Amino acid sequence: MIKQRKIELLAPAKNLECGIEAVNHGADAVYIGAPKFGARAAAVNSLEDIAALVEHAHLYNARIYVTVNTILKEEELKETERMIWELYRIGVDALIVQDMGITRLNLPPIPLHGSTQMDNRTPEKVRFLADAGFRQVVLARELSLQEIRGIHEACPDVPLEVFVHGALCVSYSGQCYVSQACFGRSANRGECAQFLSLIHISEPT
């Protein structure tokens, strides 16, 4: 059964300026990288910038989601916890996360969304995340429309997010270790060297 919901247009923003423009041009929500532990390691945003974006977005009833979507080391968990509390205090609407270890931290009452980096491509995975307390699940970018429909029909009560624009790779998000193996730069730490994008050439059929 298909459950109809109002579609939320969620736009990416690498920084405060891009986020403000996305809101000004009609985005319902914007996602932006946290000061640390985001999948775009080079896109570092200060708490002050995120707070300014939250303030601007809320003037227009738009929402701000912050990505904390890398695999964390054990020694980083306390710092992550402190950062999440700071993000909560400045009014961030939700976090997009990859590492399930975050769910074991002492968290404020802030909604968690399951990142595409979690490799969310089956109904079973979506149900698992919903049962673990995730409010929304970002599906794998590599899914077909038929596969997305199947997941929605199997999990009609779970809000799903899907990418409609952006880069793709020959590997599933969150499951590729080529960059780490070849260059010592882990895609799951926000440092993908884009190696597979460089070598993959589609041949005409």
Say what each PLM segment does:
Residues 2-29:
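N-terminal basic/disordered segments at the start of proteins
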Residues 9-12, 30-32, 64-68, 95-97, ...:
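Hydrophobic faces of well-ordered beta-strands that scaffold small-molecule active sites
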Residues 22, 99, 129, 162:
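Conserved, mostly hydrophobic/aromatic
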Residues 31-49, 68-75:
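Glycine-rich, proline-tolerant flexible connector loops at the mouths of alpha/beta enzymes
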Residues 41-51, 98-108, 142-155:
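Active-site-adjacent beta->alpha loops and helix N-cap segments on the catalytic face
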Residues 56, 62-128:
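N-terminal active-site wall of soluble small-molecule enzyme domains
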Residues 124, 147, 154-198:
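Conserved anion-binding
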Residues 197-205:
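Residue-level detector of conserved catalytic or cofactor/ligand-binding positions
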